[in-house]
Amino acid sequence: MGRSISVSFGLLAVFLSLSGTGAGLDCPPDSSPYRYFCYRVFKEQKNWADAERFCAERPNNGHLVSIESMEEAEFVAQLLSKITGKFITHFWIGLRIEDKKQQCRSEWSDGSSVSYDNLLKREFRKCFGLEKGTGYRSWFNLNCEEPYPFVCKVPPNC
């Protein structure tokens, strides 16, 4: 009886430790699971609009990554720190300032609202990325036409 309880407790501990990671998700190849989505880094450089279009054309219709919590920001930072090369300084994320009805407001390319903010410095540029100098943890305004690598966030396979 005691052995059965310790095995059950051990399995419960493993389940709870993996529950926030998305370990049970069926993600496309070369993607990393986290919570309810799959993330993939592309080193190929594109401007913001082309990177967003590329993510939307992926299987499962993704978007440039939206970062909605400090925990998700840390996951993305760790993902980028493993993949980056010496000359890669920025990565596009899905945040952009939109001019709608003469009101400038920030929103994610997937339509979700900005509920978590990690903007280092606000400038007049309309697109945002992560910078190597901050360990890919802070958001920077970048010129939307500059080519940078990017991160796509897609739903898992059904």
From Swiss-Prot:
Is Transport one of the keywords? no
Q: Which domain of life is it from?
A: Eukaryota
Major location category of this protein: secreted
- A GO cellular component entry from the record: extracellular region
* Subcellular location(s) per record: Secreted
Which GO molecular-function terms appear in the entry? metal ion binding; toxin activity
Q: In which tissues is it expressed?
A: Expressed by the venom gland.
Q: Which residues form the C-type lectin domain?
A: 34-153
InterPro entries from the xrefs?
A: C-type_lectin-like, C-type_lectin-like/link_sf, C-type_lectin/snaclec_domain, C-type_lectin_CS, CTDL_fold
Q: Which PROSITE patterns match?
A: C_TYPE_LECTIN_1, C_TYPE_LECTIN_2
What is the recorded function of this protein according to its Swiss-Prot or TrEMBL entry? Regulatory subunit of the blood coagulation factor X-activating enzyme. Activates coagulation factor X (F10) by cleaving the Arg-Ile bond at position 234, activates coagulation factor IX (F9) by cleaving the Arg-Val bond at position 226 and is also able to activate protein C (PROC). May serve as an exosite by which the enzyme recognizes and binds to the Gla domain of factor X (F10) in a calcium-dependent manner.
Q: Record's family? A: Belongs to the snaclec family.
Q: What is this protein called?
A: Snaclec coagulation factor X-activating enzyme light chain 2
Source organism of this protein record: Macrovipera lebetinus
The gene name on file is LC2
